[in-house]
């Protein structure tokens, strides 16, 4: 499971990062990461994996977002609706703390029967967001032709 999960999350050999709020059922995964040199105490990381069940847990992970290298991998791992684990968040709700700092969900992966992971990325690095911003700027700066109101 360990190497398959890393592959799903695009974590490659040589990358280092943080694993936060690890539940007991993932202690073996945590040990695997530590023994294979994936976990670092440095403030410069390639990835952050954060287990969350509510917005407070998400907020506790935010300081580590700022440790990510340019376009580092940010994964929030949360209980699936089908699991018996209690959670105040789902793939569609509860991510406001990350939205407030300019991050948006871009991918989802199944971790196991009970957990799923959402990948977040800075909106400044998402191509569709850049296109929308360019279009908005173009429309906002457009001055209608005052001589002919039918021409935009």
Name these PLM-found stretches.
Residues 1-31:
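N-terminal, charge-rich interaction modules
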Residues 15, 20, 41-42, 51:
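Catalytic cores of nucleic-acid ligases and guanylyltransferases
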Residues 48-59:
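Short, glycine-rich nucleotide/cofactor-binding loops
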């Amino acid at each position: 499971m360990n190497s398959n999960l890393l592959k799903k999350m695009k974590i490659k050999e040589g990358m280092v990062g943080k694993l936060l709020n690890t539940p007991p059922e993932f202690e073996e995964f945590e040990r695997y990461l530590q023994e294979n040199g994936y976990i670092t105490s440095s403030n410069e990381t390639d990835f952050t994996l954060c287990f969350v069940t509510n917005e407070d847990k998400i907020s506790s992970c935010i300081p580590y977002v700022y440790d990510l290298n340019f376009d580092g991998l940010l994964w929030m791992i949360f209980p699936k609706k089908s699991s018996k684990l209690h959670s105040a968040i789902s793939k569609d709700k509860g991510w406001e703390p990350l939205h407030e700092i300019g991050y948006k969900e871009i991918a989802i992966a199944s971790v196991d029967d009970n957990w799923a992971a959402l990948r977040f990325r800075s909106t400044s690095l998402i191509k569709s967001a850049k296109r929308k911003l360019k279009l908005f700027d173009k429309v906002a700066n457009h001055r209608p032709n005052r001589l002919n109101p039918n021409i935009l």
